[in-house]
Amino acid sequence: ECDVPWQEEEIKRLVIEPSFQAFQPTSTAGWFCGLNQLDTLEGLQYLDTSKVTNMNHMFSDCALSCLDLSHFDTAQVTNMNNMFSYSACLTSLNLSGFDISQVTDMWSMFDGCSSLVALDLTGFDTSQVTDMSCMFYGCSALTSLDLSRFNTSEVAYMEDMFYECRALISLNLSGFDTAKLTHMERMFRGCSSLTSLNLSNFNTSQVKYMDEVFCGCTALLALDLANFDTSQVESMSAMFKGCSSLTSLDLSHFNTSQVKS
């Protein structure tokens, strides 16, 4: 994915000149990917992204600690998968100006951003997104995440979405429309600081895979799954493994007729 001339070179400082503004790329995929020595990136304001449709892996495995991309024109972008993945040094990320109304793929967008302490995505229009799998995988420093405004009506894939978000104590998914969701395996695996999780709005009628979905949620005190329709589920293996703080769990309504494991 990182097919650029400066790929993985030990660049510490990168400057975009004003003259570069005349260039209007259609893809910035992998542009700064693998620059794991980079500590300074200047002149991003001279990068015209108005024609860009593909930003996958753009800052993947990059050593930058702060990124302000609030000025980016992302109105044409459809692909943001792995855009910031494995950028383990990133502590601050400003995406407040992002128009993601055309984006369909957010797979692993923030995967491995293990130093990110806060993330404001309240302005995100996710109405076209179909894949959110691994989106926040390994964001182990995030303590709260409000995704209540996310439109997930087209999303089929949410597996590993919050995998190993170990510091997360507040997670708001109250606006989630999961009518098309088929994959939610390991969705909350390793969210060991969550004491509560409200999934009362979840429609699971199309879900096939629920294995390890709550595995390792060691602080979870209660879990109400009364609304869960499991009639299509084929896999439930290790679904509640390690949920050592749960004192009661009512699964009497679960339809397990299709379950194989």
Features from the language model and the residues they span:
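Structural signature of tandem-repeat unit edges
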Residues: 9-23, 37-53, 62-78, 88-104, ...
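Predominantly recognizes leucine-rich repeat
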Residues: 112, 137-138, 163-165, 189-190, ...
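Extracellular beta-strand-rich solenoid/capping regions of secreted or surface-exposed proteins
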Residues: 2-6, 23-33
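Alpha-helix C-terminal capping segments
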Residues: 6-7, 59
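Register-specific detector for alpha-helical tandem repeat solenoids, activating on a conserved position
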Residues: 29, 56-57, 81-82, 107-108, ...
